[in-house]
């Protein structure tokens, strides 16, 4: 099902959406933070999706617990380190870990630039102990408004040498992409690649805006592109990658069932599309789970799954030589 001759990658993976349950428990107790459960065993349902529960509100509540315990920069560094470990232990050859320093900082008023430094330090420490390639993507969380995103951007750009790209995430309907055109001009001027969450809560126009105005060469989720034939044609022609996260889309009620997921529609239209975990800690999944789902629920053949694996490597924010090195390591 997973072709071991092709690098296995996860390009849409939120570092702040992947905090271990035991880490939430330990950090909560270490810092005197009231948790919603009185044992490690009973904590899991408050921080992870259980069964077929699907609601954006419930999903976001669980996500909030993951950053609620980031009481100091050591906690941030620990979570970053464990993200590298989890990527390696799940069998990934390469992962792009994205994070919103404002979101991670806000509960305990941590310095935004300090959060970025702690993430970088934690990842570096993880890479010494685990054999996996990692790159970082900075997120601007649009839900907190333009001024907060400016603070976030400045903290991230201060460490741009440790980033490969910038992302825009959060409330797509309440804070449309055009509010952040100036922010992304600074991103482009800094020489970073751009991806954006778009076409998830809003329609295809949000994706057009992200591509044409923000400068996105990849789109996170993008499920609503299928209602715009001209956009689908554009995506295929210009090799704009779709970072698809089927289980997360189900958990957030972006789609009502796997059967309704548009993954197959993208593939049939020749759009470059990859499989990703999104918030693996909240969804309690790993990348292999997404490939199993793609086979059993999305009805992809083994040949199609291999193509999806290759797509991920092609879409990655890597140089050609780095891509070749990933393939060479699989021989």
Swiss-Prot record:
Recorded catalytic activity of this chain's protein: adenosine + H2O + H(+) = inosine + NH4(+); 2'-deoxyadenosine + H2O + H(+) = 2'-deoxyinosine + NH4(+)
GO (cellular component) term, any one: cytosol
Catalytic residues as annotated in Swiss-Prot or TrEMBL: 200
Cofactor note: Binds 1 zinc ion per subunit.
Residues at which Zn(2+) binds: 12, 14, 197, 278
PROSITE patterns cross-referenced by the UniProt entry: A_DEAMINASE (PS00485)
One term of GO molecular function: 2'-deoxyadenosine deaminase activity
Keyword field contains Nucleotide-binding: no
GO aspect biological process, one term: purine ribonucleoside monophosphate biosynthetic process
Alphabetized UniProt keyword annotations: Hydrolase, Metal-binding, Nucleotide metabolism, Zinc
Cofactor: Zn(2+)
EC number(s) from the headed UniProt entry: 3.5.4.4
Cystines in this chain: none
HAMAP family linked to this entry: A_deaminase
Family designation: Belongs to the metallo-dependent hydrolases superfamily. Adenosine and AMP deaminases family. Adenosine deaminase subfamily.
Its biological purpose: Catalyzes the hydrolytic deamination of adenosine and 2-deoxyadenosine.
Protein name listed in UniProt: Adenosine deaminase
Protein's organism: Shewanella sp. (strain W3-18-1)
């Amino acid at each position: 099902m997973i072709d071991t001759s092709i690098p296995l990658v996860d390009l849409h993976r939120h570092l702040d959406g992947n905090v271990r349950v035991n880490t939430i428990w330990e950090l909560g107790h270490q810092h005197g933070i009231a948790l919603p459960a009185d044992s490690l065993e009973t904590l899991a349902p408050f921080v992870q999706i259980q069964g077929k529960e699907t609601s954006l509100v419930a999903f976001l509540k669980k996500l909030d617990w993951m950053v609620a315990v980031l009481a100091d920069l050591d906690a941030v560094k620990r979570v970053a380190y464990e993200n590298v470990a989890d990527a390696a232990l799940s069998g990934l050859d390469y992962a792009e870990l994205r994070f919103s320093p404002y979101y991670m900082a806000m509960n305990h008023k941590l310095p935004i630039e300090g959060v970025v430094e702690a993430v970088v330090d934690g990842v570096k420490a993880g890479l010494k102990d685990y054999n996996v390639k990692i790159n970082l993507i900075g997120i601007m969380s649009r839900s907190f408004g333009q001024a907060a995103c400016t603070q976030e951007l400045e903290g991230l750009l201060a460490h741009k040498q440790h980033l490969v790209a910038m992302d825009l995430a959060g409330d797509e309907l309440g804070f449309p992409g055009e509010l952040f055109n100036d922010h992304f001009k600074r991103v482009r001027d800094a020489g970073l690649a751009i991806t954006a969450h778009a076409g998830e809560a809003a329609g295809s126009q949000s994706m057009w805006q992200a591509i044409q105005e923000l400068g996105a060469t990849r789109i996170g989720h993008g499920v609503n592109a299928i209602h715009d034939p001209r956009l689908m044609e554009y995506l295929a022609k210009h090799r704009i990658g779709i970072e698809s996260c089927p289980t997360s889309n189900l958990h957030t009620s972006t789609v009502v069932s796997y059967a309704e997921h548009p993954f197959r529609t993208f593939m049939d239209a020749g759009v470059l599309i990859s499989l990703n975990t999104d918030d693996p800690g909240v969804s309690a999944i790993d990348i292999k789970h997404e490939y199993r789902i793609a086979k059993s629920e999305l009805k992809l053949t083994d040949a199609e799954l291999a193509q999806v694996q290759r797509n991920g490597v092609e879409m990655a924010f890597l140089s050609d030589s780095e891509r070749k090195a990933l393939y060479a390591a699989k021989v």
